[in-house]
């Protein structure tokens, strides 16, 4: 019974590490993907949200100009 809390803590740590690895892989895959047309100025973040590139102005898809 004594080692049960330790086991739970280790399990939590392992699951958060797995989520971190999966998130970074997804992020890398989205960054590598080339965009065509008007989306060329838009960067995709890990959650699929659109974010303006700071280098480009007149970035319409995300609503800011």
Curated annotation (Swiss-Prot):
Q: Which residues form the propeptide?
A: 19-49
GO molecular function of the protein, one example? ion channel regulator activity
Query: Where is this protein localized, as stated in its record?
Result: Secreted
| Cystine pairings recorded for this chain | 52-62, 53-59
Q: Which residues form a coiled coil?
A: none
Query: InterPro entries in the record, alphabetically?
Result: T-conotoxin
Against Pfam families, the record matches this protein to: Chi-conotoxin
Key words of the record: Amidation, Disulfide bond, Hydroxylation, Ion channel impairing toxin, Neurotoxin, Secreted, Signal, Toxin
List, alphabetically, the GO terms of the cellular component aspect. extracellular region
Q: In which tissues is it expressed?
A: Expressed by the venom duct.
Q: Where is the signal peptide?
A: 1-18
Cysteine amide: residues bearing it: 62
Chain positions found as 4-hydroxyproline = 61
Per the record, the similarity remark reads: Belongs to the conotoxin T superfamily.
Q: What is known of its domains?
A: The cysteine framework is X (CC-CX[hydroxyPro]C).
State what this protein does: Probable neurotoxin with unknown target. Possibly targets ion channels.
Supply the name of the protein: Conotoxin Cal1.3
Give the species this sequence originates from: Californiconus californicus
């Amino acid at each position: 019974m004594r080692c049960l809390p330790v086991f739970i803590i280790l399990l939590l740590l392992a699951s958060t590490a797995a989520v971190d690895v999966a998130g970074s892989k997804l992020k890398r895959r989205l960054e590598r993907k080339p965009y065509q047309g008007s989306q060329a100025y838009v960067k995709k973040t890990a959650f699929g949200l659109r974010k303006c590139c700071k280098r480009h102005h007149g970035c319409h898809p995300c609503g800011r100009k």
